[in-house]
C-alpha cells in the first residue's frame, strides 16, 4: 500500500508485536509473516532461521489460494503467536488503509468488523475512524 518498500510493513508489524510484549519468536514471526505468501522464500529457510514454532505460525498466517476464511481464522485463534502477529498485521494495515481507494477501504472495514475486532487493542477505534473517513468522501 502506498508504494513503500516491501520491508516497511513487516518491520512495522514487528514493532507493534514488540510493543505488545511479544518474545523473540513472535518478533521473528512478525518479520516473516508474509514471506510464504509474497516471496519465493521456502519453508525450510524460515524454519532454519526461526525454528519450528515460527514456521508453524507463518504457515497459519499464510493465505493459500481459495482459502476458507473461517478455517484460516480458526487456525490463527488456536496459536497465540499467530494471533498476536495477525492482530499487529491487521492494525498496521488499518493504519495504512487511510491511503487507499474508497471501495477497498469499505471492503477492508467490513472484513475487519467480521473477523478481526478482538485480535488487537485499538482496532475498533481505527475501524470507526476509517468508517468516518469513508462517510466524508
Regions found by a protein language model. Give the residues of each.
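Active-site helical microenvironments for divalent-metal-assisted chemistry
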Residues: 1-137
Amino acid at each position: 500500500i502506498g508504494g513503500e518498500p516491501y520491508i516497511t510493513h513487516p518491520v512495522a508489524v514487528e514493532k507493534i508485536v514488540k510493543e505488545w510484549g511479544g518474545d523473540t519468536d513472535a518478533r521473528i514471526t512478525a518479520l516473516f509473516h508474509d514471506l510464504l505468501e509474497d516471496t519465493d522464500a521456502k519453508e525450510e529457510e524460515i524454519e532454519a532461521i526461526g525454528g519450528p514454532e515460527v514456521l508453524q505460525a507463518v504457515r497459519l498466517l499464510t493465505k493459500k489460494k481459495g482459502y476458507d476464511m473461517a478455517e484460516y481464522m480458526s487456525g490463527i485463534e488456536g496459536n497465540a503467536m499467530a494471533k498476536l502477529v495477525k492482530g499487529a498485521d491487521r492494525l498496521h494495515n488499518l493504519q495504512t488503509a487511510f491511503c487507499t481507494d474508497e471501495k477497498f477501504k469499505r471492503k477492508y472495514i467490513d472484513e475487519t468488523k467480521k473477523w478481526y475486532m478482538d485480535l488487537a487493542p485499538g482496532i475498533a477505534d481505527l475501524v470507526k475512524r476509517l468508517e468516518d473517513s469513508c462517510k466524508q468522501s
